[in-house]
């Protein structure tokens, strides 16, 4: 343990080092103190649900006129990348602010704040008690300082914890949703109306602190699938919520999980009954609109024995000059023989090229493979946020259960990302696979932090981990912190890592064959990320390939 502490992870929360029949909560290794610049980030464009597979990439060099030749440019590749990213107009596509008539509670965090949120959500007494207990735990915990991220202290009294449109919709009918809100999501590329909405994906649209619409509910109900906002689920399905809320991520799991448990206002709930295959992918689109308001959503997905569900998640926020906090919790429960595939394209506003503004994205995501032969897969593309801090994890409790993690994390300018995963092997013959790709450009810092833990009763556990980093330019940094704990001699654990750099000689090689900087970078980055892109669902695949080939050409962030 001493050598692990010296090598640099301290409090890599939420999982335990000791064997336990309960869901693990944490081991806390201490990292060396690293001096990073204050959080800053990039200006990206990232469509989420609006797929455009037909869009190509301009074959001209970045910043060149139509008459320019790809072989005559004297601008360096790094300059071209920065020039290219400055031309990406996140502000126009997602950075706008809609003037929505909203009700916002006063700033500040206290028991009265929590009581007011619970009252506004029309919650039962047991839910208010859950919140109060979480808040009491939050007050006793200290904000973790062990990550590679560096940012000013957060003033939790100087933000709003609830903001919602005054015209409250009846979620059973899209006809009663405020037309302004429907038009708002249309502009974001998330159509909700009957005529325009995505035909084969059920969407729960969340703005600030409330869900404003959920599509395809009747179709899902025919299969017995429950898909609604978690606020509605607390009122309509209290027995299910009592059984599963906090079962995978306890309210005292970590600092931000405790905060979320106290003040979460909405999110999505999905329940797939026994031996049911969800007839379509389900998805949630999160949008922050109000200034100085944090978003604290809660997602709970339960897949009973023999069921299957695919979940998609996307998000954007306006281009504010100030930072905003997004502290979410995601819990996945997987029964015997069930499977959950969870895919995310994280597209929060990352700030401007000087690092002003952007979202602090501090998220706890964990899945529990509770039953034998169950499977949970996390696939994520992280391109936004001024700071990203998250470790989607899987606890492999059932025998022969499987956990997978596929990730691309992109940072540019002064963005910071400390992300990775944890695979906790508890059952017999469990398997896990980790593929992580990190791309860093500008002055950004990109850290992969991963834990593979094989507990003493996990006979025949197997893990393979691949962690690759790519650097663009000479000022970015990439760190990899693999953490391996094996307590059973029958385990087979493999880990490999690499760091590469896109250099002028490689780009010159492409140019000699008539391929300009833009296409050369797109080709190299696309190939670098292929193992992860291939795991994305079709609903994301076309968009992410375009996103990477365009934005990643400088490393996106």
UniProtKB/Swiss-Prot annotation:
Spell out the protein name for this chain: Iron-sulfur cluster assembly SufBD family protein ABCI8, chloroplastic
* Induction statement: By PHYA.
Q: Might you name a Gene Ontology BP term for this protein?
A: regulation of response to red or far red light
What the record says about disrupting the gene is: Plant have an enhanced hypocotyl elongation in far-red light, and accumulates protoporphyrin IX.
Q: Which GO terms describe its molecular function?
A: ATPase-coupled transmembrane transporter activity
**Keyword Transit peptide recorded:** yes
The record ties this protein, via NCBIfam families, to:
PRK11814.1, sufB
Plastid recorded as keyword? yes
**Protein source organism:** Arabidopsis thaliana (Mouse-ear cress)
Q: Name one Pfam family in it.
A: SUFBD_core
Region feature (Disordered): 1-47
Q: Where in the cell is it found?
A: Plastid, Chloroplast
State the UniProt keywords alphabetically.
Chloroplast, Plastid, Transit peptide
The family line of this record is: Belongs to the iron-sulfur cluster assembly SufBD family.
The organelle targeting sequence, given as a residue range: 1-52
- Low complexity bias (residue ranges): 10-24
A cellular component term from Gene Ontology for this protein is: chloroplast stroma
Major site of localization recorded for this protein: plastid
Q: Which InterPro entries match?
A: Fe-S_cluster_assembly_SufBD (IPR055346), SUF_FeS_clus_asmbl_SufB (IPR010231), SUF_FeS_clus_asmbl_SufBD_core (IPR000825), SUF_FeS_clus_asmbl_SufBD_sf (IPR037284), SufBD_N (IPR045595)
| Covalent S-S links between cysteines | none
In UniProt terms, what function does this protein have? Involved in light signaling, probably by mediating the transport and correct distribution of protoporphyrin IX, a chlorophyll precursor, in response to far-red light.
